[in-house]
């Protein structure tokens, strides 16, 4: 894990800090580097670490200081409250179901989706989407978020419709919740 952090830090150093003439990489924590990365690029990032390593502190700092149009979502109500955000299903007006990544299922989802204009406008103007507790998000739900953003933003060729994604979570904590039947449906796709 330590080598991955070092590699990540070096990549950020040459991509962001050198051009910006910021602090030396030795003077910054990985979370300070992640903050600079989110603030000064449009690239997506996965931020992980065990409890107490600064993930929530980074999120709070971004809420206050980030000039980007930003939304924070989480897979459950409790996680959304803790992150001061909303649930994924609420933001994207998704029913509580499996989302198989087939053309027929996608067409059906979009036909049934009824999103009010303010929410459509919010998604079209969105620049940064933070998903907290990402370890609890099933692959089909993440694919659906991608499909909805591509469609709503009229950018079908860009991942997540061109929205910068910040995935926060610890993959060693909670895993996605699904019944055995659900996993049987999802297994051929994921």
Regions found by a protein language model. Give the residues of each.
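Polybasic, lysine-rich low-complexity intrinsically disordered segments
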Residues: 2-3
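Conserved ATP-binding/catalytic motifs of P-loop helicase motor domains
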Residues: 9, 13, 20-190
């Amino acid at each position: 894990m330590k080598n991955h952090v070092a590699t990540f830090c070096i990549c950020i150093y040459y991509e962001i800090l050198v051009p910006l003439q910021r602090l030396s990489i030795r003077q910054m924590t990985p979370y300070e580097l992640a903050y600079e990365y989110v603030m000064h690029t449009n690239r997506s990032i996965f931020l992980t670490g065990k409890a107490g390593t600064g993930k929530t502190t980074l999120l709070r700092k971004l809420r206050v200081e980030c000039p980007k149009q930003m939304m924070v979502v989480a897979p459950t109500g409790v996680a959304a409250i803790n992150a001061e955000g909303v649930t994924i299903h609420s933001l994207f007006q998704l029913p509580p179901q499996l989302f198989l990544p087939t053309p027929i299922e996608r067409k059906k989802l979009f036909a049934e989706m009824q999103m009010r204009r303010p929410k459509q406008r919010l998604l079209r103007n969105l620049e940064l989407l933070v998903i907290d507790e990402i370890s609890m998000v099933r692959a089909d739900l993440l694919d659906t978020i991608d499909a909805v953003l591509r469609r709503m933003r009229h950018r079908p060729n860009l991942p997540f419709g061109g929205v910068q994604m910040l995935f926060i979570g610890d993959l060693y904590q909670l895993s996605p919740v699904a019944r055995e039947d659900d996993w049987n449906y999802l297994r051929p796709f994921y």
